[in-house]
């Protein structure tokens, strides 16, 4: 399959790499239909970010079609349209059960970010816990709606997590510092939670 490969700071290539396979009983393999570049991807692209030369891309926002499932997967089946969140846990440890799967105690790598999403196929771990099943198929949605759905893989969820962590409630006045994608999604989230006034602080007058 084709995948973006990090060669060195400032240089990415598209190369042929091995297609991922099922390795654990709750894995799925997903054919990516949409992916995007996060601001954090640019850290390693610009600076190297301690990445090894010719290593996996840092992409972590994607959605696609389930192609293969492990024997213990019950949430989805081949052919399902899903969103693959950037950070996810096992669903069983204390952190996950408390709602903080971003700090899962059982993720098999130092960070539970699922790198490598800028590829034709991805392997997704803990599919029963973290995959988001979307009704229908990609062709049922407009391009604009697909882009909106893709934000649920990271940036909108991150913005909502900020509003939830701040316990924004109906009638609250909220200040969001930073007008990047996450900040703007935090504004949306604060409005969803009933904030009466929202101030977005930034250096960009046009925003």
Language-model features: locations:
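Conserved S-adenosyl-L-methionine
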Residues: 192-197
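NAD(P)H dinucleotide-binding glycine-rich loop of Rossmann-like/cofactor-binding domains
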Residues: 90-177
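N-terminal Rossmann-fold cofactor-binding loop
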Residues: 201-204
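Cytochrome P450 core scaffold surrounding the K-helix E-X-X-R motif
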Residues: 40-46
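Glycine-rich beta-strand-centered segment in the early N-terminal region that forms part
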Residues: 18-35, 48-96, 115, 135-142
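Hydrophobic/small residue at the entry helix of a nucleotide-binding pocket
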Residues: 158, 182, 206
């Amino acid at each position: 399959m084709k995948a973006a490969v990090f060669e060195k700071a400032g240089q990415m290539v598209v190369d042929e790499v091995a297609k991922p396979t099922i390795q654990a009983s709750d894995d799925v393999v997903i054919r990516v239909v949409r992916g995007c570049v996060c601001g954090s991807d640019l850290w390693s692209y610009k600076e190297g970010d301690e990445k090894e030369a010719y290593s996996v891309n840092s992409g972590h926002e994607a959605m696609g079609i389930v192609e293969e499932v492990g024997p213990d997967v019950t949430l989805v089946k081949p052919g399902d349209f899903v969103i693959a969140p950037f950070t996810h846990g096992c669903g069983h440890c204390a952190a996950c059960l408390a709602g903080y799967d971003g700090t899962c105690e059982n993720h098999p790598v130092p960070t539970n970010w699922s790198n490598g999403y800028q590829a034709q196929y991805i392997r997704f771990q803990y599919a029963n816990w973290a995959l988001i099943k979307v009704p229908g198929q990609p062709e049922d949605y407009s391009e604009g709606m697909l882009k909106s759905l893709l934000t649920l893989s990271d940036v909108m969820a991150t913005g909502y997590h900020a509003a939830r962590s701040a316990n924004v409630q109906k009638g609250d006045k909220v200040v969001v510092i930073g007008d990047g994608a996450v900040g703007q999604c935090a504004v949306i989230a604060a409005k969803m939670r009933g904030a009466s006034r929202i101030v977005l602080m930034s250096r960009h007058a046009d925003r």
